[in-house]
Amino acid sequence: HLSLRRQRQMCIRDRLSSLAQHISHGDYSARLHIHSGDEIEALANDFNNMADTIEDNISELHFSMEKQEQFMGSFAHELKTPMTSIIGYADLLRSQNMSEDETNEAANYIFSEGKRLESLSLKLLDLLVVKNQETILTPTDPALAVRNVINVMKPELAKEHITLKSSCRKGCCMMDIDLFQSLIINIIDNARKAIDDNGLIHVAGTVRDDNYVIIIKDNGRGMPPEEITRISEAFYRIDKSRSRAQGGAGLGLAICSKIAEIHQAKIKYKSAVGRGTVVTITLPNIKEAAHHE
């Protein structure tokens, strides 16, 4: 009996040693399955519990690292447009003879975009990292948000021979204007990446019943039906080679979904290959009386 017990103990020892090697080489799912009803089974259970803890900790570490990478990608993507605007207007001041009014206008754009950059960076930090901080929404005319975006993006799009037009009627919605402008910027920027030559992006806004509806339409290359349901997923790209060439982390539309959720808004995508894309944003419109109460 002692000989059999010793052999059994050696067998268990070898299995424990083998399991430890598996775990040390990254196989965190390896486990011992022993049902002997004695202290050896208890030892195996202790070892399995230890392996469970290691696997959980490693998974949590990987998840945390992935979230950090996503945040850095999102952050860089979101700050690109205001930074481009600031650099563009600063370059105008540096390289061209401008009138006093033009100089003041460019300086005001640089200042306002710098302040927006400061505000947006803090809000994105809350949105993407903290997530549990409540966003403060105030009554705002969505046409103002669109107009601000048009003023910032129009000069840069013109350099790429893309015309940006807008026709928005006045409304009143509960919103965080910085975050909502980020939503509009992301959608327009996504349209830009889908346009080859002689591009046109049109932004229209109007009140429909109890909603304010913003429609962003482009004449780009469009998307196949199977891609539409996936375009708001983080890191998903319709044309990965094009996206790498033009920059961006692939998180813009995923952020749009988060911002829309904060504003109780709905985003609908309609597209066809070769015919462009239409993005419809619908958000609650409050009455003017409520705005002045």
Across the structure, where does each feature detected by a protein language model lie?
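Membrane-proximal HAMP signal-relay module
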Residues: 5-9, 13-72, 87-94, 129, ...
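Short helix-loop "hinge" at the ATP-lid/N-box region of the Bergerat-fold HATPase_c
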Residues: 190-192
